[in-house]
Amino acid sequence: MNAYKWGDRMKHIGIIPNRLKDTDLKVTERIATWFNKSNLSAYTTPDIAEHIQAHTIAVSEKELYEICDSLIVIGGDGTILSVAEAASIKDIPIVGVNLGRLGFLADIEPQEIEVSLQKLLEGVYEIEERMMLKATIISPEDEKYVFHALNDINVTRGSFARLVEFEIRINNELCDVYPADGMIVSSPTGSTAYNLSAGGPILVPHANTYVVTPICPHTLYAKSIILSDHDTIQIATLEEAKDMALSIDGRLKMYLTPQHVVHIERATQVTKLIKLSERKFFDILREKIVERRR
């Protein structure tokens, strides 16, 4: 039983749908209608509010993160990843409604919506804190760009047609040089995503570790390296590779030159996930592995 019930401390709940998943906004409508019946305030952006019949308070996206105590994210794991950074900065818990394939983050299935919302109202849920990663990119002009990831930070060769030699430093000490298509730095949450597809290890969600994994390395001995959350990573390249891509949680953020340096460490903020389901991590993992074998 959680000490903070909706309607008690959490009085302002934002609804963020993925329009590519909830195309007709019927799921959004169901959730907003439930809020109306429960005398709770639901907030959406104007472009959503004008397309549903149920009453919601229309605010800008920026105001949504300023006002709301918690967020309902409708779509799937990818949709949760898209809001994780902004929510973590404001320390806002997220609960996901899964309209995609089997996911690790979205906890509510469409057929469970009303029952799950009632559990939230009664405080029958837990809040999991998920470790995040921070990437600081230093440009040749000494400009700094900072990003935060819940899943992973990837540096890949982009449109460059050849392998790239990636120099990896751990805690400012040279670790190795990897000839590869790219490097994945993954949190425990992201270890079951791109990292797993690239042959990296699975980390349990609560582990105080993260992992760096080469993508298609051109050497037999190149393996993943598991680091403690106190370690730092520096990624640079040793040749004139053009248009290398930096992706954060699967989204392209910027292109890099060999003169850019990428520093990665554990972030100070965390993503808070509201968990209602009885499904455990390894239950979901087994289902996902079976799905991939089909």
Predicted regions and their residues:
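ATP/NTP phosphate-donor binding region
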Residues: 2-70, 74, 111-126, 137-147
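Short glycine-rich anion-binding loops that position phosphate/pyrophosphate groups of nucleotides
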Residues: 20, 77-79, 102, 189-191
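Short glycine/serine/threonine-rich phosphate/pyrophosphate-binding segments
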Residues: 24, 78-84, 192-197
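Short, acidic/small-residue loops that bind anionic groups at enzyme active sites
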Residues: 90-108
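Catalytic core of DAGKc-family lipid kinases
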Residues: 102-181
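ATP/nucleoside-binding phosphotransfer catalytic cores, i.e., glycine-rich phosphate-binding loops
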Residues: 155, 160, 171-174, 221-294
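Short aromatic-centered micro-motifs
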Residues: 168, 190, 246
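Gly/Ser/Thr-rich active-site loops/lids in small-molecule metabolic enzymes
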Residues: 176-180, 184-221
